Regions:
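Extended, well-ordered protein cores
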Residues: 1-235, 239-267, 271, 278-347
Length: 347
C-alpha cells in the first residue's frame, strides 16, 4: 500500500488532470518544452501517413536499442536547444540528433531513414553521443554492434510498420501482435544469450527455481513505443494491457527502495551482479509480477478504471518516475539499488 500511495502521489503531482501519456520513447524526445520529433516531422515531406510511420519506426527502434542505462557519468549537450540531459532523456535526444544527421541513411537526400545500419561504427556513435574519458558511456561497443546486427537482420526498421499493419484486422491491431513481430524479427540481434534448438531466446534467463524466465524488457519497451506511430497512421491498437510491465531498474528499484522487496543477504547490496545471476533474474521477474499487483491499487487511489488508465499509463506516470525519484533520494547519481554489469543491451 505504501508504494501505491507514493506512485499515486507522483502521478497527481505530475499530471493533475490524470491525462498521462503512454510509457514510450517519445516522451524522451522533448527538451525545453519542445517536442523535437514533432518539429522534425513537420519540416519533412511525407507522401503519405505510411511514409511518416516508417520514419518514426526507424527513429524509435534505433533509439530504444540505444536506450540501455548510460551509467552515472554520461551527459549530452544538445546544441539546438541548449539543454544538457542525462540517462534516458539524454540518450533519447542524442539518438534523435544522430538519426536527424542522416548517419543511418544510405542517401543524403533522404536522411530520415535507417537503412545503413549494417555498416554503423562505434566511432560514429561515440562522436554523436559526445563520449570521452570525461564523459563515458556504458556499453558503447555493445550498442553499436546491436545496431549493426539490427541492420543485418531486417535491413530497415521502418519496414516493420508494413509487417504490423498487415496483421491488423479491420484496422485493429492487438498490442501483443506488435511484440510478436518484434520477437520474431529481432531475435537474431541478441548475441551471447541463451539459444534453444537454434533459436536465440533474447532477454530470457535460467533461474534455479523458476526455470526459463522470459522478460524481453527492451522488446516490450519498443512495443509500447510503437503504439503511437501506428495510431498516427490510422490503426486502432487494442489490448494494450496484453503487454507486461517492464523489468528494468526504475520499476524494480521502486520495490527495493520502498521496502516491498528485501534482500535475503544484505551484503548483496554492495556486490556487483551479472544480468543472468539468479538474484537479478528473480528481482526482474518479481518486478513484472508486482507491477500487475500495484497497478489496480494505484487506479483505486486515483479513482480511474483500467480501460482509461492501462498499465502503460501507470508505468509512465507512475512507477518509473517514482522509482527514479526514490533512487535520487537514496543514492548519489540516482543509480539502481543493485550494482549490475551491463553490456548496454539489457539495462
Amino acid at each position: 500500500p505504501h508504494a501505491a500511495d507514493a506512485v499515486a502521489r507522483v502521478i497527481r503531482e505530475q499530471y493533475p488532470s490524470l491525462k498521462v501519456p503512454f510509457h514510450a520513447r517519445w516522451r524522451h524526445f522533448h527538451a525545453r518544452g519542445r517536442d523535437l520529433w514533432a518539429e522534425l516531422a513537420e519540416e519533412a515531406y511525407w507522401p503519405d501517413r505510411a511514409a511518416r510511420a516508417r520514419a518514426a519506426f526507424d527513429l524509435c527502434v534505433t533509439s530504444v536499442l540505444l536506450d540501455a542505462g548510460s551509467g552515472p557519468g554520461w551527459k549530452f549537450l544538445d546544441g539546438p536547444t541548449g539543454s544538457t540531459t542525462t540517462r534516458s532523456e539524454g540518450l533519447g535526444i542524442a539518438s534523435l540528433r544522430l538519426f536527424q544527421s542522416g548517419a543511418f541513411s544510405t542517401t543524403c537526400d533522404d536522411p530520415l531513414r535507417a537503412d545503413a545500419l549494417a555498416g554503423f561504427e562505434a566511432a560514429t556513435l561515440a562522436r554523436a553521443f559526445q563520449v570521452s574519458d570525461a564523459n563515458p558511456l556504458v556499453g558503447l561497443e555493445g550498442r553499436a554492434a546491436l545496431l549493426r546486427r539490427l541492420g543485418e537482420a531486417i535491413g530497415r526498421p521502418g519496414d516493420l510498420y508494413d509487417v504490423m499493419a498487415a496483421r491488423a484486422v479491420e484496422g485493429r491491431l492487438p498490442a501483443p501482435q506488435i511484440l510478436a513481430v518484434l520477437l520474431e524479427r529481432l531475435g537474431p540481434i541478441w548475441q551471447n544469450r541463451l539459444v534453444i534448438d537454434g533459436v536465440p531466446m533474447g532477454d530470457t534467463w535460467r533461474h534455479p527455481q523458476l526455470g526459463l524466465v522470459p522478460i524481453h524488457k527492451l522488446s516490450q519497451w519498443l512495443a509500447y513505443s510503437l503504439i503511437e506511430p501506428l495510431q498516427d497512421a490510422g490503426l486502432d491498437v487494442i489490448d494494450i494491457d496484453g503487454l507486461t510491465g517492464l523489468a528494468e531498474y526504475r520499476n524494480g528499484g521502486l520495490f527495493i527502495d520502498d521496502g516491498v522487496l528485501v534482500l535475503k543477504d544484505p551484503a548483496d547490496i554492495d556486490r556487483t551482479h551479472a544480468v543472468g545471476d539468479p538474484l537479478v533474474v528473480g528481482w526482474r521477474s518479481l518486478t513484472v509480477a508486482l507491477l500487475d499487483r500495484i497497478a489496480p491499487l494505484v487506479r483505486e487511489r486515483l479513482e480511474v478504471g483500467a480501460e482509461v488508465f492501462p498499465l502503460a499509463r501507470v508505468l509512465e506516470g507512475g512507477t518509473w518516475a517514482t522509482g527514479r525519484r526514490l533512487a535520487a533520494e537514496r543514492r548519489a547519481g540516482g543509480g539502481p539499488p543493485l550494482k549490475i554489469t551491463s553490456d548496454g543491451t539489457v539495462f
